């Protein structure tokens, strides 16, 4: 009996020693640097895995060399012949054939955000096709799902340096039916994206406000409606159905977010932090000061509160331009990461053709969006950076290297909008541009050996 007890105790002690050693080994594995690569908006329409240009292949190696590579997937992976486009008030319906997920995987992308205004471009069939194809190639995601609980939950990817999490939301969803809704015991929720509902107001100077009031009053009079006799001094706002104007001393976009949505997202960040080593938070937002390349006030405040809630890296997507980099409480905030892929869809819906004043039977693949939309002539949408963010063994920010890229708009349509590493003066120009728009945040960026280095 004594021998059996002694044997049992020996087995228990050996087991404890084994598990302690195993746990120690695992902790050592996580007590190492963690490298995150991040890219911005990805609108991909053509295969890229066949490209042999070293400027592209070296960029791909940067993504593959990171512990985790993140991207904003601003398209649907969907066979458009098997479904139909959703009705949209603005923007063409964006899609890529299911092989797009394989191209992402080939590039080394591990984690994607789906909370944006294109995820639902082919309605629920398109959404579920995108989710299925990402699952098929084992790319993790956040920001969309079968209901609001699934759309709002973090996505996790396991890495050799520990798990990374993603929380993704969108404040730009013109079609409210693209938003996911809650399920309850008696009815399933609506599939869709993870929203931040907002109320938009345009602040204008007194002169513009007076002109707007006069125009509104004249329209109402012409329609035979009763016009309230009020002096401009007596009113603070004007409502034009979907638009609201308020008086001020300058022009500014004011966005008021739904506080319940914000609290829901902060809660998701805290959950992600408990279950992962590094937490990435992304927002998709189109409102902002495009002239000065600055986010609206609520977004800047939101990004900092996300850091306070546990985010290690905050990224805004949507403006399709490179805006400023801020370091807040030792964590990076990219106020807009610009484009990574910006390819035109090979087919768009009939409504989109009509919106551009084109015959609905136009199927010319050589048609350039530049011919129908001045926006595409903006040089800022054709260049950006790929940041490589390194956290040390204690999860403190150690290093940020900014690799400048360009998406050559003068290439043939099948090669346009593909990222290439920039070199020489082009590289310097991109980094100097980012340095300029990051100055208000007291972020010091140095151009050195073809890349940007952030002084920490």
Outline where the language-model segments fall.
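Bacterial N-terminal signal peptides that target proteins for export
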Residues: 2-12
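Acidic, metal/ion-coordinating pockets
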Residues: 27-456
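Membrane-interface motif at the C-terminal end of an N-terminal transmembrane signal
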Residues: 23-25
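Bacterial N-terminal signal peptides
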Residues: 11-21
